Design a protein with these regions (language model features):
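Sequence-level preference for short, compositionally simple segments enriched
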Residues: 1-163
Length: 163
């Protein structure tokens, strides 16, 4: 069994917290925007056994295969949790108890805000949706990204890391 610290480190390095905002689908009678929240860890296909252990650790989520045909890229597996209630009940409390140490803590904090807003149905109001869109826009803006308006971003000290 994996440790909580290992899960935190793996998420800091290979994981993501994100949200998607989908417009209403009139053909299905929907009037409101849909907000989808995601937590995932993506690893090369030769590490699928590790992702199975992550799935076992949390007891929720699913594994999926992603084929990549680009030169110099590997196909991968993805462990993902997209069920809002499971994210609220399992993923958020876990990372509150065992905090992330890297830049992704900002994405986690923003996802937590989005999840709470969606559970309260705030995405069904114009002001609530606008607030969620603002939080979504702040996600994935790290100190070495070309972003100037993100209040979470602090300039890095010393040498910047090579990518």
């Amino acid at each position: 069994m994996l440790s909580a610290d290992y899960i935190v480190g793996l998420t800091d390095g290979e994981g993501s917290f994100t949200a998607y905002i989908r417009p209403p689908q009139a053909k299905h009678g929907a009037k409101n925007y849909r907000v989808e929240c995601h937590y995932y860890i993506k690893l090369r296909d030769d590490n699928v056994a590790l992702l199975k252990k992550v799935k076992q650790f949390f007891g929720i989520g699913r594994l999926s295969f992603q084929r990549d045909r680009r030169p110099h890229h590997h196909s991968c597996f993805r462990y993902e949790v997209t069920n809002l209630e499971q994210i609220a009940r399992v993923i958020i409390p876990f990372f509150q108890r065992y905090p992330l140490q890297g830049d992704k803590i900002r994405d986690f904090v923003l996802l937590n805000k989005i999840v709470r807003a969606v559970l309260k149905k705030k995405h069904q109001t114009r002001t609530g949706l606008t607030e969620i869109q603002r939080w979504k826009a702040e996600m994935h803006q790290y100190a070495d990204s070309p972003n100037t308006g993100n209040p979470f971003v602090r300039p890095r000290q010393g040498k910047s890391r090579a990518r």
